[in-house]
């Protein structure tokens, strides 16, 4: 493949991955399927009932791996039957989103019903309004992951089958969403009533923000907030992962010669080192900008 064509293919994959990462994070924010879900689950036990959709089917990586693998399996079967690629991928994503919606409903009903002793109600309006939103986000995520996987198989001649690639990318996008976007949801949304940078005192466990800008807060309110930063950052992280992982071999194609293969390895190592240094500089700059915690200042005084 020509280098220019290869870069175009990588750009398309990066764009699809960016969308997938964004929708994956926002889906987890609507249903609170993320690391901060522990506080959503704990809140009724601490006598803080709420209207936040509490599903947490599993961790985000296995959950997204499941729906992407289901979508990839259905799409592969349909393409084997000579169905159009676009229709096969769309139908695969639709089936995956339906399965995901089923898990959402059973998880919400089961987890909330188990908290009856803590007087946590099951809100049927929350179930009806939030589940279609999560299914829509899951459809977009699965569709984009299948697009990336199909391009790798059909255009880049990757040796792995479509379903396995979709499974791997599903784990990846779930892991990135769990480590990137969840910080915004947990620290900046669930505990907006706590001073920034102060950490979570044990006395505040479960005391999440339950009142919204208007009325009581729900999962869609959280998704609206996280769409401003957490979702796009997750999409950017996943898009960069997909694009940069293929960029080094597109520029230094190992198929040309052994030297180019080693150059691609060196370029990858240099790229990782640059990202580590950049991340460290951002962290140091943030700490200098916000300063030390007040408790540390008082102890020093």
Swiss-Prot record:
Keywords: Cell membrane, Membrane, Methyltransferase, One-carbon metabolism, Transferase, Translocase, Transmembrane, Transmembrane helix. It is found in: Cell membrane. Its EC number is 7.2.1.4. It comes from the Archaea. Disulfide bonds: none annotated. This is Tetrahydromethanopterin S-methyltransferase subunit E. GO terms for cellular component: cytoplasm; plasma membrane; vesicle membrane.
């Amino acid at each position: 493949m020509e280098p220019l064509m290869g870069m175009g293919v990588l750009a398309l994959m990066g764009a699809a991955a960016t969308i997938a990462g964004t929708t994956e994070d926002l889906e987890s924010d609507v249903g609170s399927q993320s690391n901060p879900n522990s506080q959503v689950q704990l809140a009724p036990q601490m006598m803080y009932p709420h209207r936040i959709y509490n599903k947490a089917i599993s961790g985000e990586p296995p959950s997204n791996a499941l729906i992407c693998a289901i979508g990839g399996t259905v799409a592969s079967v349909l393409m084997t039957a000579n169905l159009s690629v676009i229709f096969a991928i769309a139908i695969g994503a639709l089936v995956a989103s339906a399965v995901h919606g089923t898990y959402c409903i059973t998880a919400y009903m089961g987890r909330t019903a188990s908290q009856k002793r803590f007087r946590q109600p099951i809100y049927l309006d929350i179930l009806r309004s939030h589940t279609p939103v999560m299914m829509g986000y899951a459809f977009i995520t699965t569709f984009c992951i299948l697009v990336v996987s199909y391009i790798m198989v059909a255009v880049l001649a990757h040796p792995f089958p479509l379903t396995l690639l979709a499974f791997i990318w599903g784990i990846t996008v779930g892991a990135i969403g769990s480590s990137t976007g969840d910080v915004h949801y947990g620290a900046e949304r669930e505990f907006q009533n706590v001073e920034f940078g102060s950490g979570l005192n044990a006395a505040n466990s479960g005391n999440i923000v339950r009142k919204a800008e208007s009325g009581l807060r729900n999962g869609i309110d959280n998704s609206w907030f996280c769409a401003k930063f957490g979702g796009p950052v997750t999409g950017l992280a996943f898009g960069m992962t997909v694009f940069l992982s293929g960029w080094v071999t597109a520029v230094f194609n190992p198929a040309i010669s052994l030297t180019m293969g080693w150059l691609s390895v060196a370029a990858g190592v240099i790229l990782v080192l640059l990202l580590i240094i950049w991340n460290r500089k951002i962290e140091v700059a943030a700490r200098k900008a916000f300063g030390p915690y007040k408790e540390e200042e008082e102890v020093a005084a």
